[in-house]
Amino acid sequence: MAGALRRTMVYLGLAESDDEYISDETPRPRDTPQSAGGSSAAVSESGSTSVARRSPEYRAPVTPIKRAPSSREDENELRTITTVHPRSYNDAKSIGEAFRDGTPVIMNVSDMGEAEAKRLVDFAAGLVFALHGSIERVTAKVFLLTPSFVEVRDQGHSDDIDEEPASLEQVEG
């Protein structure tokens, strides 16, 4: 199994070929036809046959390709945060598009009615679940939606924040 993996890596140019890893049992293309006896023979112009010699395969020199920088490195340098003050559930599209593009979203639902705000928060919770992000309550009606690659650091001011965040149903006002 390791031999097959090694040959595949050599074929794809991911590893350099070592002659000790290549066995004689490896099928190779042959330029000469096989005789009925099963041995390979070459027919010369004079009609006599001679045993064909195996010549080493020519391998072109391979230059390794350098990987392009990952887009994750660019995402680590966060430059924008989208703040949305939705007035109705119809504004959910702008929240979803920004979050899907990898931008953290601050969603302030204080201008909405309780039922519509709950519906929008449920949408946001499903959105962050589907895209492996997270949602945090900042204040009673302000939520932070963060993509999976964004880390939110707490500065240790837990005195002002309740230990367990209240849901929209518990908050009046």
From Swiss-Prot:
Region feature (Disordered): 17-85
Domain of life: Bacteria
Biased composition (Low complexity): 35-52
BP-aspect Gene Ontology terms: division septum assembly; FtsZ-dependent cytokinesis
Keyword Calcium: no
Keywords: Cell cycle, Cell division, Cytoplasm, Septation
Stored InterPro entries: Cell_div_SepF, Cell_div_SepF/SepF-rel, SepF-like_sf
CC annotations in GO: cytoplasm
Record's subcellular location: Cytoplasm
Major site of localization recorded for this protein: cytoplasm
Physiological role: Cell division protein that is part of the divisome complex and is recruited early to the Z-ring. Probably stimulates Z-ring formation, perhaps through the cross-linking of FtsZ protofilaments. Its function overlaps with FtsA.
Family: Belongs to the SepF family.
Oligomeric form and interacting partners: Homodimer. Interacts with FtsZ.
Protein name: Cell division protein SepF
Taxonomic classification: Bacteria, Bacillati, Actinomycetota, Actinomycetes, Micrococcales
